[in-house]
Amino acid sequence: FLNFYNKLNEITTLKDISIETLVDFIVALIPAAILGAVIFGWYAALILTITTAAAILLEFLWNLIFKKPQTLGLLSAAATGLLLGMCLPPTVPFWVAILISFIAILTKQIFLLIKQAPLNYIALARVALVIIFPAIMTKFVTPFSLDAISAATPLASIYGDAASATTVKEAFFGIHGGCIGETSVFFLLIGGVYLIIKRIID
């Protein structure tokens, strides 16, 4: 999905993007997003809502201040916000969800102004928060847990306690610690296959 967003990074005007493409991208994200909300609970769903709403609002305010048309940019912002939320751990404070949206939308607008995209603005926003708030951005919890029990990701398990290692089945279906929308290979593949069928990616 970040590879698809690299294509959006290269576009200097939203006139080159169709509504159908953005809608297809959002639809492709939904299976993994729903799974994240199911296994990590209502707060994960709230984080996804906050990042999406914040991205749309920030894009709207930017367009309003600089007198730009409120067109496809808002749909692009919705896709950006949803993907940002999926890249966050399910335990982050709500203000982190707002901050990552602010960084991403601001970076995106700067790239559009200079008509260059040297970096992926979504990845840049996430990396910035990992550097600034490493403890917050690397705190993962056990799925379906009512309490915030720390849990290792599959990659961390490889280098940690063998007893806590995630099984292949758990890793494939996403039943392990991780970011909200990044745990399940299966549900991400569903989205990827959908984009291939729609000929958005190849």
Residue ranges of each PLM-predicted region?
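Hydrophobic, membrane-inserted alpha-helices
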Residues: A28-L35, A55, E59, A77-G85, ...
